[in-house]
Structures are given as C-alpha cells and as structure tokens.
Amino acid sequence: MSQVMSSPLLAGGPAVGLAPCEEPRRVLHPAPSPSLPPPCPYYTTEGWGAQALMAPMPCKGPPGRLQPAPQAGANASCLLKAPGEQVSGAQEDLDSYIDFSLESLNQMILELDPTFQLLPPGPGGPEAQPTQSTTLGKKKEEPEALDIKYIEVTSTRSRCHDGPRSCCSPSVTPPFGSPRTGGLLLSRDLPRETRSSSESLIFSGSQGRGHQHPAPPSAVPSSHPPTSPSISIPGMGSKASGPHGLGSPLVASPSLEKGLGGQGPQLSSRVSMLSGSPASDISYVFGSSQSLLHSSISSHQSSSRSLESPSSSSSSLNNLGPVSLYTRASDLQVPSNATPSMGQPRATRSPPLAKEHASSCPPSITNSMTDIPIVLINGFPEPGSPPSQRTPGPQDFVRPGATSSSMPCPATRSHSQTLPEAPPTASPEGPARDMQPTMKFVMDTSKYWFKPSISREQAIELLRKEEPGAFIVRDSSSYRGSFGLALKVQEAPTPAQSRPGEDSSDLIRHFLIESSAKGVHLKGADEEPYFGSLSAFVCQHSIMALALPCKLVIPQKELGGGDGASDPSADGQASCLKKSAGCHALYLSSVSVETLSGALAVEKAISATLERDVLPTPTVVHFKVTEQGITLTDVQRKVFFRRHYPLATLRFCGMDPEQRKWQKYCKPSRIFGFVAKSQTESQENVCHLFAEYDTLQPASQVIRLVGALLQDPERM
C-alpha cells in the first residue's frame, strides 16, 4: 500500500497515522515480536490502542530487509527502505521473501476467484527497482501509470499504539482532479475529540504487482478511462487461508468482490462496506469535508461497484470530522454545509457539484437508518425541493426531508445533476405531493371553513348536504378562547341504524380545539401535537387524519349552497325557522315578573334591577336560539354552566322599551331580555335580562328569531 490514512473510524483510537515522508519509501512495521525493539510501532489483531498516530522508528536490521512477525495474528507486512542505500545481500533476501509472499497471496486469491490473473514473482517486479532520484522524477513525470483505488480495511478489535511523532506526509492526496480515482482519501488533520470508535479505514494505493508505490503529491491529473473495481481488504481479525498469517487478500476482480458476502465467515466477521452512491449516507457525511476537490470531475462509473452495509456505514461515519475527499463525481453528493456532530468546528463551505437534489438529514447523522417524515407547520415538504431520488441498493434512498425543530441537522442540502430523477417513493404522509394542500392554499380558503360567529346548529345546517370530510371551525360557545370543529363523517355502515326522517345531523361530529400558550390542540387526543395556528392544524389534518375520524377536505367554495354565513332572517320568517342564531351577551339577572309578559315584563325587570343598591356583576354567556328553544352557556362558569329554556316555555323576547343601557364593568350597552315560564312556580313568569357584549354580535338576530318561532303555530 502506498498510504496508510488517518481515520476517525477506528475503534478506541483517534486516527491511524502514517510515517512521515522524510524518506520517500517508508511503511509500517508488522505486528510486534520479542525480536523487535520496544519502541517499534505495530498493528495487532486485538484492537486499536488509545493513540492512533504511528511514527516510524529506525530499523535495527539491514535497510532493505523485511522484518517478519512471528505471531500468527500479524496480518500486515511492510517494507522499510532507507533513501540512497541498497545492500545487495539484503536485496536478495527481500526479493526471495517477496516472491514467497506473492506465491502465498496468489494461492489465496485463486481459492476465492479462479479467474484471477496471477501476479508473476521475480526480481523484475517494482520492488526490485532502485530508489534513485531519477526514478522518482520519472514517476512524477508519468502519473498516468498510476491506477489509484480505494481500499477498505475493517477491524473491530484493532489497536494502534503510540508513536513519538505524528504523521505529516504531504503525499496523502492523490493527483488532483484525476478521473481515474475511485476511492476516498481521509485527512489526518483530525482533532482527537472528533474520532469515532467504528471499524472502517480507507486509504488509497496504486495498482501494482507486488509493492505499492506512493502517489507523488505533485503528480499531474491523468486522463485515462475509469479505473477497475475497488480493492477490499477484510478485517484484521479475520481468519486467513494462507501461510504466514496473510489474511488480507487483494480483490481485483468483480466476481471476487461480489463473493465477499458469501465468503464472509472465512474472510471477515464484520466487513465495513461503504457506499459512494449519491443517495447514501456516506456522501452526506463526506460532503462536510474541509476541502472539496475540483467540481468538474468526470463521472463514468456507477455507484453499484461499492458494497453497502447499513449496519456499518452509519456507525462508522457518524462522528466524522473535517476530512479530505476525493471521489468520483457520479458517486458523490456534496452538501454545501453540514455539521455532522456536536462539538466539532463547522466545516468550510464547499462549492456544490450541481444544483438539484432533495434536502434531507442523512440517516448516519441522525443515528437512524430511515428518515422519519415529519410534516412542517404547513404539512408539506420544503418548497423547491424535488421528489426523492432512488438508486439501486438496499440503502440508497432519500426522502424529501421536512425540516423541523426536532431534527438536529442544521443544513444538509445536497446537489446532484448526474442522476436522473426517479418517481417519488411512497411515504406515510398520505397522498402525493401535488395532491397535498399547501399552507398558502389553506389560508386562502379560510373564509370558507372558518366561521367564528355561527352557532352549532348553523354549522350542522351548512354541513348537512356536504361530502364526508367537510368541516367548519367556529368559536366555542362553551369554552372561551377555544374553537369548535364540526366535521361530516362517513356514512353509517348499516342503513338500519338510521331512523325514519333522519336529516343526517348525527353524521356531523363536534370536536373541541383547545388554545393555550403551546398552541392549538385537539382536546382528548394526547397523541396529537400542538400546532401554531388553526391553519396549521387544518393543513396537517387534511394530510393525515391523526385522531379525527377522517381527513379534512379543504373547501374551495361556500358550504351549504353558497351563503352559509348569511343572516338567518334575510329571507323572512321561513328562512328563520330553518336556521339558528346565537351571540355572546352579558347576563345580568333574572327577575320574577309574576304574570306579566311581553314588553311590560322586560321594562319592569330592568327597572327593578337598576334600582338595586348593589348592581349585579355581569357574566359573559353564549346566547343561542334554535328550534328547540334558548340555551344559555356560562363561558366563565361563574353563575351556572348551562341552562336550557324550551320553546314551549317562552313568552316574549325583546329590547328595553325605554332604550336604557348597561354601563357597569363595560361600555354602554343596550339591554334586552326574554320572558319564560318559571321552572318552580307554574303561575309565574321570570324575565332574564342581558346586555349586548359585542357590537359585531348584536342581539337583534336572536330577538327576531325568537319572535318568528313564537309566531309559528305549529311549534307552539
């Protein structure tokens, strides 16, 4: 391998380091043995240590000789070469050892993939080339000979021990803008607190026959076609099938890469399979990189070449900090600004590759494998976001996320032009996007469904002939500051339940919408959220029924045939008999008028009330008139809760003949009252006095309706 990259994805350790590039070819030592010096850094199969930065140590043996590890768990072999020094004896031993290693490697690969082309051993390989400055210069001038790939190393119990120096190799980044590169390169400038305890290490290397040469930092971008499939290395703790503990076979054929899933028990217990597809969570996390490479990278390869694992990718990339990203344009979606985890510095804003993609919080950032659709206050995804795109793969799905206060991700707006739009996937939000009402539509049609001044009976009349789902929101007459919801529900399942002559009023159900500092809420439905306004409540329930019997249907015209909110007395007495009227009024007192009735009874009751030494304290009530009589509801529950006076007991209703006004605890208001038969004394009448409470709700409507009902001979 040419580079061992730092990564926050390794368990227990901050990063995996790389030897400083003071020497052009220096790599890591194998696992420790008693013959090695104590300060020599090494890999183990048990886990990564507390510190992950590995530093090179001077080799005690010949400069060009490999130091093999006697332990069976050592899965990595390294080369250590001093610049400008070549010992012939050591070189011969090195060549023989490399030939033996290649033979073991070929045997292992042939067991997995018989179609693999063997790597020929011999001194003619790249490992026998002298490390002269002219050779390095030639390599720098011929970067097209490189075929950089990405390599995945997974280990659940690897440990990297401390080293005296940190890695600062400048050759960590491959040729800038090269379209051949298909891998991900991680930066080592990761702060200690941003490193995770996951199991994925990603680094790059050039395709060679035995030894991997480092990619020169000053290399020129290559113009070759796309590279071959990626190289995957199983975890350090996996069982090996070859001698000398070589348990990391290089996979260079598509069939072998596909066979990794079937060979899982033999190769690795938990292989981290990362996805570079545009809709995967990796592209979101890596989109918050500190530096984004050239945006004009050509996209030729499909994202289906990289394996995917929902259980590994989300956990290994959850707390990823600012990293250097190098990948294909077709395999990446770049969020313009993202904050993957708390406590990390905000990543530098990167130029997007394109302009079109849905806005969503990736699953890996929110510690969830699926995005839970949360409808906004308007019950509709964010305007301007296209429908979700779906690419092949078990995990590559992104819904158009609805940004809400419960989402910890501040912004993950990704953009992509390389993928065609796919039809939106089904979501539990109900109808499709073009069928869902927007907040603006709900507010524009509020004049049809919000009738604050109508009564319960008027709402029933308006909804009587409407389809199920029709509704009206009005001011509650029983609970001050709350709202009443009248909803037309589905028809009864059995017609036998309907009574003869039924007017379908039983199909209209009434609900109370409470209003508080938290917002409006459907009373008695603990599972329902609080909404900031009635429009938000209506919009959400027009998408999802939630606790209601059915979804609300937003009206686009006046309910009840055109003028549901018209004055009941506009068309004369016949129209009044079919309607009901109501208003808020100040209840003053009830005075016995003996056998008097009519206007004289009202005049006498008002005079007796005003002549008192202490005037009564008025209370706000809802005065409602229907075909059944008059119903009084104490809004504040001060004097009574509710009183009903049947139509048969009513005698008269009218204003004060002397036009006197009530002025205590309110502005001057006209006084009116109605005379009804006493409920205790059958021979006496009682006059109930009121004062107008709101100029927008005059008492003239209820007075005219009571007069019309009293003059109807059939209802007396």
UniProtKB/Swiss-Prot annotation:
This is Tensin-4. The keyword Nucleotide-binding does not apply. GO terms for cellular component: cytoskeleton; cytosol; focal adhesion. Interacts (via SH2 domain) with Rho GTPase-activating protein DLC1 (via C-terminus); the interaction is independent of DLC1 tyrosine phosphorylation. Interacts with integrin ITGB1; the interaction displaces tensin TNS3 from the ITGB1 cytoplasmic tail and promotes ITGB1 stability. Interacts (via SH2 domain) with E3 ubiquitin-protein ligase CBL (phosphorylated on 'Tyr-782'); the interaction is enhanced in the presence of EGF and reduces interaction of CBL with EGFR. The modification Phosphoserine is found at S248. Residues 214-228 have a biased composition (Pro residues). GO terms for molecular function: actin binding. Promotes EGF-induced cell migration by displacing tensin TNS3 from the cytoplasmic tail of integrin ITGB1 which results in dissociation of TNS3 from focal adhesions, disassembly of actin stress fibers and initiation of cell migration. Suppresses ligand-induced degradation of EGFR by reducing EGFR ubiquitination in the presence of EGF. Increases MET protein stability by inhibiting MET endocytosis and subsequent lysosomal degradation which leads to increased cell survival, proliferation and migration. The gene is TNS4. InterPro entries: PH-like_dom_sf (IPR011993), PTB (IPR013625), PTB/PI_dom (IPR006020), SH2 (IPR000980), SH2_dom_sf (IPR036860), Tensin_PTB (IPR033929), Tensin_PTEN_phosphatase (IPR051484). Keywords: Actin-binding, Cell junction, Cytoplasm, Cytoskeleton, Phosphoprotein, SH2 domain, Signal. Residues 449-556 form the SH2 domain. Residues 583-704 form the PTB domain. Residues 197-206, 265-274, 402-419 have a biased composition (Polar residues). GO terms for biological process: protein localization. It comes from the Eukaryota. Residues 119-274, 301-322, 334-366, 379-436 are annotated as: Disordered. SUPFAM superfamilies: PH domain-like (SSF50729), SH2 domain (SSF55550). The keyword Cytoplasm applies. Belongs to the PTEN phosphatase protein family. It is found in: Cell junction, Focal adhesion; Cytoplasm, Cytoskeleton. Residues 138-150 have a biased composition (Basic and acidic residues). Residues 1-17 form the signal peptide.
